[in-house]
């Protein structure tokens, strides 16, 4: 009597599911024996008790072999994968849970699946595929992957059972990254997760650079099923004054610095002296307008920066004159001025008098920070200032040209424009659902600028919510093709947005796309490191594959090597034969999911 060790080649060969079903060959003899024994018992050739005992034994062995054989066939049937399914909305509602997020159907990947994948890599899988009619044995004739579908089918057949995969809603506070190549299913995944957010009653903002009509229809369908009416829609190229909405990106602010930050978020690249001075310039103009009771908008900022600081400075100092000046203030101020030049206009001379009075006559404790910042620009080199404004004006031109003039800088007094005016605060308070079609295929630069402005606006409002302790409404932000619009505010949302009630999901195609936008792979990895959750679809780029798999860890893969040896010795005149067999089991530490298989999903 002997036993086969667990690690022997014979035991592994018999327990291996990816092989010919030898067990079925033994089923026929066992069942034939059962029939023959039943006949012998019926004819009283064998004692009834003995016949029944032997019949039970043969039937049991036949059933055992049949079960093992069908198990092998089922495992081989699963190698044909699973067909892409279109889920009905009613079925999606069955899986809905407001405390968790459903991400689809599948199985938990364990080391045993890595072992199966490693074993399959040694085989010619095409020889293991079952004919179409045999899939009917397992009710899979209409569920196997179709030939025209992309991906290796056996990757989805490594486990016989699938279940609903869920993650607790709280886990998504740290941000979600969806990565996958073109047509790999990013839009479907975004739609599935976004639909659940709409059903939960979140304030939902979806930024779609491409402007997929299919995605918008899914957006509308989810809102209809949730009873939330038709979603809001913003399109930067919309020339209609009746369709869509106008969105005021400068409506919510605490200081002029926030407005300056939003505008400068459109400028790519790292901070430098130019960006710092340009930011300070925009901030000064915004603060001056706020001090005068005017609401800054992209349009009015562009107009004032183009004209210069003189008009705003004149108005600000005149306010101080009305409040604090004595009757002879003009004579006092002119005493500090040199003789008037011939080419000096009345307007310039008047402003010089006001500046002289403010700087030399008005007591220092009555000076204000806003006027002081305006005076810095006033005394600054005109040549250098013109260079700064010449670089800033193209940015404002992108954000205020054509339809964007009314869309991003709405005028409430314009009776001809019937579109409603929304801002980030009103959108969140009403738990609105906003679809942003950036139309990047038509104009990528405008799309990137508008997307960056909206993200900057949301970041500023998230900071306000955090400061005021407002977390009553959950804000779900979804950004498709994030490499087109990512900026520092979006990075801040990924890093700290949950504190302000913003839960961000971004989708990208490859890591190099993000690196190209941000300027370096290091910057791209820093952004991706802020995403605590990852959903990986089919990835063709090797750098992206490595980024995904390095977070999965490693496991041990077992190999059994068999060595057979024979030896013939006839030097003594008589043949002498010797033989031997050895088995060597090794374990190698490998990636739990090899990187190259991400390109075969």
Give short role names for the model-derived ranges:
Residues 242, 514-515:
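Short acidic/His/Gly/Ser-rich catalytic and metal-binding motifs that mark active-site loops
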Residues 1-206, 212-229, 291, 319-324, ...:
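Accessory regions of macromolecular translocation/handling assemblies
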Residues 2-7, 138, 147-149, 156-160, ...:
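P-loop NTPase motor domains
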Residues 509-513:
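Conserved H-loop
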Residues 235-237, 508, 538:
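Residues at the C-termini of beta-strands that transition into short coil/loop
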């Amino acid at each position: 009597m002997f036993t086969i060790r667990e690690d022997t080649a014979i035991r592994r060969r018999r327990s291996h599911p990816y092989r010919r079903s030898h067990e079925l060959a033994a089923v026929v003899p066992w069942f034939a024996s059962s029939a023959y024994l039943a006949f012998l018992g019926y004819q009283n050739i064998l004692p009834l008790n003995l016949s029944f005992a032997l019949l039970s034994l043969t039937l049991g062995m036949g059933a055992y072999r049949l079960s093992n054989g069908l198990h092998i066939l089922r495992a081989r049937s699963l190698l044909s994968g699973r067909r892409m399914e279109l889920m009905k909305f009613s079925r999606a509602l069955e899986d809905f849970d407001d405390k968790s997020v459903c991400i689809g159907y599948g199985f938990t990947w364990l080391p045993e699946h890595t072992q199966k994948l490693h074993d399959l890599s040694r085989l010619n899988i095409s020889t293991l595929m079952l004919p179409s009619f045999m899939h009917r044995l397992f009710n899979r004739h209409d569920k196997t992957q179709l030939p025209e579908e992309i991906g290796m089918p056996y990757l989805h057949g490594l486990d016989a059972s699938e279940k609903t995969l869920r993650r607790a809603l709280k886990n998504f506070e740290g941000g979600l990254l969806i990565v996958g190549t073109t047509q790999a299913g990013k839009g479907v995944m975004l739609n599935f997760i976004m639909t659940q957010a709409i059903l939960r009653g979140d304030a939902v903002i979806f930024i779609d650079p491409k402007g997929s009509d299919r995605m918008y229809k899914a957006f509308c369908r989810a809102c209809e099923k949730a009873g939330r009416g038709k979603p809001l829609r913003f399109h930067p190229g919309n020339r209609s004054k009746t369709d869509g909405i106008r969105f005021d990106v400068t409506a919510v602010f605490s200081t002029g610095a926030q407005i300056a930050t939003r505008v400068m978020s459109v400028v790519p690249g790292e901070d430098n002296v130019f960006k710092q001075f340009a930011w300070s310039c925009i901030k000064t103009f915004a603060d001056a307008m706020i001090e005068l009771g005017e609401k800054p908008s992209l349009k009015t900022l562009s107009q004032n920066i183009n004209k210069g600081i003189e008009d705003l400075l004149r108005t600000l100092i005149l306010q101080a004159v009305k409040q604090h000046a004595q009757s002879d203030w003009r004579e006092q101020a002119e005493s500090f001025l040199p003789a008037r030049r011939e080419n000096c206009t009345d307007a310039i001379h008047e402003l010089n008098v006001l500046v002289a009075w403010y700087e030399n006559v008005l007591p220092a404790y009555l000076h204000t920070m806003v006027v002081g910042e305006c005076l810095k620009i006033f005394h600054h080199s005109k040549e250098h200032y013109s260079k700064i404004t010449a670089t800033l004006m193209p940015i404002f031109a992108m954000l205020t040209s054509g339809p964007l003039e009314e869309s991003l800088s709405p005028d409430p007094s314009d009776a001809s424009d019937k579109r409603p005016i929304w801002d980030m605060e009103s959108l969140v308070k009403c738990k609105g659902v906003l679809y942003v079609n950036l139309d990047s295929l038509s104009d990528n630069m405008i799309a990137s600028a508008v997307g960056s402005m909206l993200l900057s606006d949301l970041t500023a409002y998230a900071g306000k919510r955090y400061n005021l302790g407002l977390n009553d409404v959950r804000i779900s932000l979804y950004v498709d093709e994030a490499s087109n619009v990512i900026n520092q505010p979006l990075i801040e949302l990924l890093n700290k947005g949950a504190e302000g009630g913003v839960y961000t999901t971004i989708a990208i195609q490859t890591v190099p796309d993000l690196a190209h936008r941000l300027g370096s792979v290091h910057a791209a990895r820093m952004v991706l490191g802020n995403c605590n959750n990852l959903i990986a679809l089919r990835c063709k780029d090797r750098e992206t594959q490595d980024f995904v798999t390095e977070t999965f860890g490693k496991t041990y893969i077992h190999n059994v090597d068999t060595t057979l040896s024979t030896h013939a010795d006839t030097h003594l005149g008589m043949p002498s034969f010797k033989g031997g067999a050895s088995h060597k089991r090794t374990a190698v530490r490998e990636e739990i999911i090899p990187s190259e298989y991400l390109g075969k999903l």
